[in-house]
Amino acid sequence: MDSRDQEKHEIERNGGQREDGVGPIPADVMRAVEEDIEAAGGEYEEAPEYEGAIGRTMFDTPYSEDGTVTVLMPKENIEDVPRQSLVRIKSIEDERSYLGAVVKGPFAEPDGLRADSPILVSVTVRGIVLQPKHHGRVQVEIVGEELNDGAVVPPRRRPLPNSPVFVLDSPETADVLGTGGNVRLGVADGHEDIEVCAPADSKVVFPRHVGILGTTGGGKSTTVSGQVAQLQKIGTAVVLFDTEGEYTAINKPTDDEQMKLALKRRGLEVEGVDDTHVYHLVGRETANPSHPDVRSFRLDFYELSPYAFKEILGLTDAQETRFFQACEACKLLLRDLGIYPRRGNQQEQREALEVDELETGYPRMTLSHLLDIGGAILHRVAGTEGDPRIFNDAFKNDRELFDRRQKLVKTDSAPSWRVLMGKLWRLHRLNIFDNRGAESVDYEAMLQPGRVTIVDLGDMESTEVRNMVIAQILKGIQRQQDRNYQEARQAGNRPTPTMVFIEEAHEFLSSQRIRSMPVLFEQVARIARRGRKRWLGLVFVTQLPQHLPDEVLGLINNWVLHKIGDSNVVSRLRRSIGGVDDILWSSLPNLAPGQAVVSFSNLSRPLMVAIDPTPCKLLMVE
């Protein structure tokens, strides 16, 4: 029984009256209406093209913007279009199909009235139940136009008004967004069944470098530890510069009850990271001495470029001149004594002519060698009586050659030499350079598949020493990865991917530092450029992104943005990161811990993501 027949039945049952007291429609009127309906082809039926649509596009207004359309929908469909939903818009008249993303809304608007009209304000304030009917509205950004072969190209036109709009289901949404991969970040906000991942077996993301930014407490450590755990599982070599020692216990499962509950809700396991190794500088302590594999290491003076070394020390022009005079005299003395290159060794003879001091120091030169040369020159320039004190046996055994070489240095200004030697001696007293009680870093072992090396820098007060450690290890990693890459190519294999995480990157590469340390920055930039082709990726982690210079931001192609409250920082990042819509930028200051805006090269558009809880133990986390 249809609605008209039902109405007739009710009227007959009530003695010719409707229940609401309104008299019946005259029979001849109803008959005329029915005849008109039949003449028009029967009752209205929605066109098949509109079946299943959640809404339709609205006409444009003077306030419409390029690239976006307004979609209206009945109130029962509002819940079907959460934020970040992907939709398909079928422009019927011109037979075009578009893909779009919900960037604003959904909003509830009254039918036929302004939401701020006096009558609605009065009804709402007084709690009267006679609320008007309402509908939903969303703003959709056009992502692309779908061609007949399934390809998506940049849109050349706009969908026409009254075009039906369909919500993509989760599998199709994930396919359009490109969320597939073997390293999981979390789930898309509003789409708990869509996992947001990155492909570690492609050069699209990690070898093109990542920035993880956010204020304290935003969830950066959770993101970093979770990524390290997953990269280890798929055989990536990971090196993590840990400035606080908080990652030195990731070999154990998390003991945080809230993390355990969050992991259970996501269906994830509580587990530690396998194959972890903790390195700390000789003479320093680690935050986790109970770790099963703790190793001390030394710095080798010859591994550092003298140009990077003098920048890190912050030498003045006068001190810099004298530093290079001492280095040059020391090189000649090492050659004369056959320390390097060794006499009769043709390969070392050739290598000595090709040493690039912008990349590395002079082989086998130690800080102690430089102190002997510099001390003797200062002794002579200052007019000190007696013979200068010499510490190296090789120099003592040929004192005549040593004296002749240091006297060939034409120089003056004892004060500059004295300040320079004071700085070098302070470094020497730390006993971190060329210390025979500790081993050099074994980069070949460090870059084995699935190995996680945590360089604990927490027990270092000196930023200069910390930066020397990072600079030397970065350079060693680059050289080893170059060798691994060449060997893999010759064998027809893919090299082991390597990821290097640099915590508190603003201390290593701040705007002020790269202005005073251009050589050091150029080394990092060279690693970034070469690393893209050699499966070597850098991850810059910082809570103070305002201190990162534009030159560093320009090296990064993938971003995880946690809560950032400073509007000036957000404005600056907007100039460096493209494709993020306004609503995501405006949400950054209000993100909850664990939420992040993710802009990765494999994603078709940036997404708000609920980052997965960390399965492993972090120290110093409240």
Identify the meaning behind each predicted range:
Residues 2-22, 36, 40-48, 57, ...:
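Phosphate-binding and hydrolysis-coupling loops of NTP-dependent motor/remodeling domains
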Residues 28-177:
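Conserved ASCE P-loop ATPase motor domains encompassing nucleic-acid-directed helicases/translocases
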Residues 129, 520-610:
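Conserved ATP-driven motor cores of ASCE-family P-loop NTPases powering translocation/secretion/packaging/pilus
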Residues 140, 148-209, 615, 620-622:
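P-loop NTP-binding catalytic core
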Residues 184-280, 550, 598, 621:
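Glycine-rich phosphate-binding loop of nucleotide-binding enzymes
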Residues 210-211, 453, 539:
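Conserved beta-strand position immediately N-terminal to the Walker
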Residues 230, 245, 249, 255, ...:
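P-loop NTPase motor domains
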Residues 241, 502, 541-542:
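Hydrophobic residues in beta-strands of the RecA-like P-loop NTPase core, especially within AAA+ ATPase
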